From Swiss-Prot:
Protein name: Grainyhead-like protein 2 homolog
Polar residues compositional bias, start-end: 98-109, 440-451
Gene Ontology cellular-component annotations: cell-cell junction; chromatin; membrane; nucleoplasm; nucleus
Assembly, per entry: Homodimer, also forms heterodimers with GRHL1 or GRHL3.
Associated clinical condition: Deafness, autosomal dominant, 28: A form of non-syndromic sensorineural hearing loss. Sensorineural deafness results from damage to the neural receptors of the inner ear, the nerve pathways to the brain, or the area of the brain that receives sound information. DFNA28 is characterized by mild to moderate hearing loss across most frequencies that progresses to severe loss in the higher frequencies by the fifth decade. Ectodermal dysplasia/short stature syndrome: An autosomal recessive ectodermal dysplasia syndrome characterized by nail dystrophy and/or loss, oral mucosa and/or tongue pigmentation, abnormal dentition, keratoderma affecting the margins of the palms and soles, focal hyperkeratosis of the dorsal aspects of the hands and feet, and short stature.
Entry-linked PANTHER family: GRAINYHEAD-LIKE PROTEIN 2 HOMOLOG, TRANSCRIPTION FACTOR CP2
Gene from which this protein is expressed: GRHL2
Miscellaneous information on this protein: GRHL genes (GRHL1, GRHL2 and GRHL3) show a paradoxal lack of redundancy despite their extensive sequence identity in the DNA-binding and protein dimerization domains and the fact that the core consensus DNA binding sites are identical. They have related but remarkably different functions during embryogenesis because of their differential spatiotemporal expression patterns during development.
Principal subcellular localization: nucleus
Domain Grh/CP2 DB, residue spans: 244-482
Induction record: Expressed in proliferating cells, the expression decreases during senescence. In keratinocytes, expression levels decrease upon calcium exposure.
Compartmental location: Nucleus; Membrane
Transcription activation: annotated segments: 1-93
Assigned keywords, A-Z: Activator, Corneal dystrophy, Deafness, Disease variant, DNA-binding, Dwarfism, Ectodermal dysplasia, Membrane, Non-syndromic deafness, Nucleus, Transcription, Transcription regulation
Length: 625
């Protein structure tokens, strides 16, 4: 067939015919008619359409309404002979011009087998959720991207040009009687003047078969760009491009260090237990648009630097957790401020060092987080330089089923206690001023012979806002810390989800798939072993108020009895003479000393020992320094 005839094709949709007088030994009723008729015997009432609209199935209601109206048309006004589909070029051009009612009125009723649809885009997409597995591989047909009609036996391809691009309906097959030829109806279109949509040639899928009153939303790939579209978004509406909009900006409202190393990310000083604001916003090419699909999920986590492997990080986290006052102590907490909750939702504490939430890229999101560990909490040695930590933010597409984030950024932090961050900044400012002063003095001495005056060298201003640095690596998995006991509890309550193929096909939310199996994340479950030490030893540093040097009290057992024995051994005070034993915190709170405080909250702590004589004995108070 010539190229000229191909360029003049109009949309001709082939639909199954209803009751028709027999001819050419064909049956009067085809199986397609019987299948479609089964959905049209009951009229589409207003209640039916309303229910379908409520369920988000507006396209199905429109498609069924069109087919229902089609079967009301008399047979002699809606039929066209199929045998003319491959005749001469004149017949082909003549058939392409049958879009008007005048041409349709000249058709003969006995030979007509094809319905001519006017230039109305019809969405005949089918729902993938209703697939029958037994039919997925029976009718696998591959079609080339050529725009010409394909002369395949039993198959007629009709080309559409001047219409709004819509999804193509997959090949539909129904069983036929003996002696009947198998016919497959294919709808194909070409897109024009729609630069935002990818070419849909070869978009046919064999495994998308369902009832004709269903719809589906499909994701497709063109080169390296992925675009996602819901069924409710029209063809003329903006399509949310996940990759092109994957540029985000995160800021931390904390003082930035004045000594930034070249080539490394920003360094920020934080105070332990103090809340800091993090702002998340989109800065990509799509920022000026109102995205119809605009929800993303971000995970904020505290991790170690990249030079620490997974085993090292887990080792540090387990050591830190073993020294906490309570097993429920988290590394990272998020505040329940109203200012924060107005911009985010679906908050989940997915790990002890990570929280996740959803937010709208059309709006700026703001959260308040606090870090509960010091940089020096990962070593038992005193005076050791603290380990650098990072606040890392991974942002995932909310509807994308990939474990790969669309954006990742980080900020280095050092965590201090008791306003140590402010002291560190002041020290850096003093050092910078001294260095600037020395440099200015030496330069003035070199230019002493000249009469010109040197301008003062401006000092680097401290910034109260730190910008996160984008990480190019989107494939490495962050280390999420969940203690063994808490992990077992999560398993029993069904709150841990694994990254499996079944779940990926099920379409669950991304964060629920972030946890890898316990054997992969934490290593194989260790077998029960005897404790290396029969009892846990506790070491206290105490001194009297008049002394300058501390004494070390080694408790043979982490109990009140063990503490009294250590005091008796060190200071010669009989155990039976100790009537009361108290602990006074830094805030001045006086509590009775018990075994739990000694075992979990007092190891390597420093105290001032005060012994007061009473009638019934001595009252011993350990005042925390």
């Amino acid at each position: 067939m010539s190229q000229e005839s191909d360029n003049n094709k109009r949309l001709v949709a082939l639909v199954p015919m209803p009751s028709d007088p027999p001819f050419n030994t064909r049956r009067a009723y085809t199986s397609e008619d019987e299948a479609w008729k089964s959905y049209l015997e009951n009229p589409l009432t207003a209640a039916t359409k309303a229910m379908m609209s409520i369920n988000g199935d507006e396209d199905s209601a429109a498609a069924l309404g069109l087919l229902y109206d089609y079967y009301k048309v008399p047979r002699d006004k809606r039929l066209l002979s199929v045998s003319k589909a491959s005749d001469s070029q004149e017949d082909q051009e003549k058939r392409n011009c049958l879009g008007t009612s005048e041409a349709q009125s000249n058709l003969s009723g006995g030979e007509n087998r094809v319905q001519v649809l006017k230039t109305v885009p019809v969405n005949l997409s089918l729902n993938q959720d209703h697939l029958e597995n037994s039919k997925r591989e029976q009718y696998s047909i591959s079609f080339p991207e050529s725009s010409a009609i394909i002369p395949v036996s039993g198959i007629t391809v009709v080309k559409a040009e001047d219409f709004t691009p819509v999804f193509m309906a997959p090949p539909v097959h129904y069983p036929r009687g003996d002696g009947e030829e198998q016919r497959v109806v294919i709808f194909e279109q070409t897109q024009y003047d729609v630069p935002s949509l990818a070419t849909h040639s070869a978009y046919l899928k064999d495994d998308q078969r369902s009832t004709p009153d269903s719809t589906y939303s499909e994701s497709f790939k063109d080169a390296a760009t992925e675009k996602f579209r819901s069924a409710s978004v029209g063809a003329e509406e903006y399509m949310y491009d996940q990759t092109s909009s994957g540029t985000f900006q995160y800021t931390l409202e904390a003082t930035k260090s004045l000594r930034q190393k070249q080539g490394e990310g920003p360094m920020t000083y934080l105070n332990k237990g103090q809340f800091y604001a993090i702002t998340l916003s989109e800065t990509g090419d799509n920022k000026c648009f109102r995205h119809p699909i605009s929800k993303v999920r971000s995970v904020v986590m505290v991790v170690f630097s990249e030079d620490k492997n997974r085993d090292e990080q887990l080792k540090y986290w387990k050591y830190w957790h073993s020294r906490q006052h309570t097993a429920k102590q988290r590394v990272l907490d998020i505040a329940d401020y109203k200012e924060s909750f107005n911009t985010i939702g679906n908050i989940e504490e997915i790990a002890y060092n990570a929280v996740s939430f959803t937010w709208d890229v059309n709006e700026e999101a703001k959260i308040f987080i606090t870090v509960n560990c010091l940089s020096t909490d990962f070593s038992s040695q005193k005076g050791v330089k603290g380990l650098p930590l990072m606040i890392q933010i991974d942002t995932y597409s909310y509807n994308n089923r990939s474990n790969k984030p669309i954006h990742r950024a980080y900020c280095q932090i050092k965590v201090f206690c008791d306003k140590g961050a402010e002291r560190k900044i002041r020290d850096e400012e003093r050092k910078q001023n001294r260095k600037k002063g020395k440099g200015q003095a030496s330069q003035t001495q070199c230019n002493s012979s000249s009469d010109g005056k040197l301008a003062a060298i401006p000092l680097q201003k401290k910034s109260d806002i730190t910008y996160f640095k984008t990480m190019p690596d989107l494939h490495s998995q962050p280390v999420l810390f969940i203690p063994d006991v808490h992990f077992a509890n999560l398993q029993r309550t069904g709150q841990v989800y694994y990254n499996t193929d079944d779940e990926r096909e099920g379409g669950s939310v991304l964060v629920k798939r972030m946890f890898r199996p316990m054997e992969e994340e934490f290593g194989p479950v260790p077998s029960k072993q005897m404790k290396e030490e029969g009892t846990k030893r506790v070491l206290l540093y105490v001194r009297k108020e008049t002394d300058d040097v501390f004494d070390a009290l080694m408790l043979k057992s982490p109990t009140v009895k063990g503490l009294m024995e250590a005091i008796s051994e060190k200071y010669g005070l009989p155990v039976e003479k100790i009537a009361k034993l108290y602990k006074k915190s830094k805030k001045g709170i006086l509590v009775n000393m018990d075994d739990n405080i000694i075992e979990h909250y007092s190891n390597e702590d420093t105290f001032i020992l005060n012994m007061e004589s009473m009638v019934e004995g001595f009252k011993v108070t350990l005042m925390e320094i």
